[in-house]
């Protein structure tokens, strides 16, 4: 991640929302450059580290929080759970998300794992930690990203417009206290990982339930369809 001002890296609405942690974003850029200088790579690639914040802040109606990026080289693209269109096979968690998507909404299974269309339609796909060392899960937890993403979540919740947070797993559920205030509802279930999907993720209908909560608050539903 190059040393640039926050408003050059993210969408204008997000630049304002993240202003309280601008110095922390700068510090994280310094951390990543130090990692590279020490011969340690990170994922996703530099231009994608803040990708979740390049979509309009004011248009977010759904928040889906992941833990940290996929540690498999070639998988992480800066949006939680999403992968590049050419990635095969899909990560198991994403395959389970797509199975629930098909069961919940009746749509065919998507042709690839690229969730960019969701992000373009108002779904914030945010990892709690925005980078990871390749093949080393959770390696950048506790390095400082949590302050940045906590600020982002609180800023979303503080708006007066409706939003639904989809919280998958225990780690995501701990964020519920940050969502207090504003007009934010939440949906909780086990994580879609193979270890927990059969314990309540399958059958939880997060996509249709989120749209019901949005329309009940006078907001437009999300078009969840993927190619």
Swiss-Prot record:
Subcellular location as annotated: Cytoplasm
SMART domains reported for this sequence: UDG, UreE_C
CDD domains xrefs: UDG-F1-like (cd10027)
InterPro entries: UDG_fam1, Ura-DNA_Glyclase_AS, Uracil-DNA_glycosylase-like, Uracil-DNA_glycosylase-like_sf
Pfam families from the UniProt entry: UDG
Enzyme type, top EC level: hydrolase
GO biological process terms held by the UniProt record: base-excision repair, AP site formation via deaminated base removal
Keywords of this entry: Cytoplasm, DNA damage, DNA repair, Hydrolase
The keyword Cytoplasm is annotated on this UniProt entry: yes
A GO CC annotation given for this chain: cytoplasm
EC number: 3.2.2.27
Main location: cytoplasm
Positions of the catalytic residues: 68
Gene Ontology molecular function terms on file: uracil DNA N-glycosylase activity
Keyword hit for Ribonucleoprotein: no
Catalysed reactions, semicolon-separated: Hydrolyzes single-stranded DNA or mismatched double-stranded DNA and polynucleotides, releasing free uracil
Domain of life: Bacteria
Role: Excises uracil residues from the DNA which can arise as a result of misincorporation of dUMP residues by DNA polymerase or due to deamination of cytosine.
PANTHER family referenced in this protein's UniProt entry, alphabetically: URACIL-DNA GLYCOSYLASE
HAMAP family recorded: UDG
Family: Belongs to the uracil-DNA glycosylase (UDG) superfamily. UNG family.
Protein name (database record): Uracil-DNA glycosylase
Recorded name of the encoding gene: ung
């Amino acid at each position: 991640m190059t040393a640039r001002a926050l408003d050059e890296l993210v969408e204008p609405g997000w630049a304002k929302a993240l202003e309280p942690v601008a110095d922390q974003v700068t510090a994280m850029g310094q951390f990543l450059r130090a990692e590279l200088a020490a011969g340690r790579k990170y994922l996703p690639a530099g231009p994608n580290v803040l990708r979740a914040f390049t979509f309009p802040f004011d248009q977010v109606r759904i928040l889906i929080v992941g833990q940290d990026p996929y540690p498999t080289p070639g998988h992480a693209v800066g949006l939680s759970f999403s992968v590049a269109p050419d990635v095969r096979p899909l990560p198991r968690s994403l395959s389970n998300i797509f199975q629930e998507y098909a069961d919940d909404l009746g749509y065919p299974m998507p042709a690839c794992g690229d969730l960019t269309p969701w992000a373009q339609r108002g779904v914030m796909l945010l990892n709690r930690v925005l980078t990871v060392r390749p093949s080393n899960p959770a390696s950048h937890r506790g390095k400082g990203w949590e302050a940045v993403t906590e600020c982002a979540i609180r800023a979303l919740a503080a708006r007066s417009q409706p939003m639904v947070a989809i919280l998958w797993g225990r780690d995501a559920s701990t964020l519920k206290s940050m969502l207090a205030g504003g007009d934010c509802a939440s949906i909780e279930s086990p994580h879609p990982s193979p270890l927990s999907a059969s314990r309540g993720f399958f059958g939880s209908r997060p996509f249709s339930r989120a749209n019901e909560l949005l329309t009940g608050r006078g907001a437009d539903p999300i078009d969840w369809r993927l190619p």
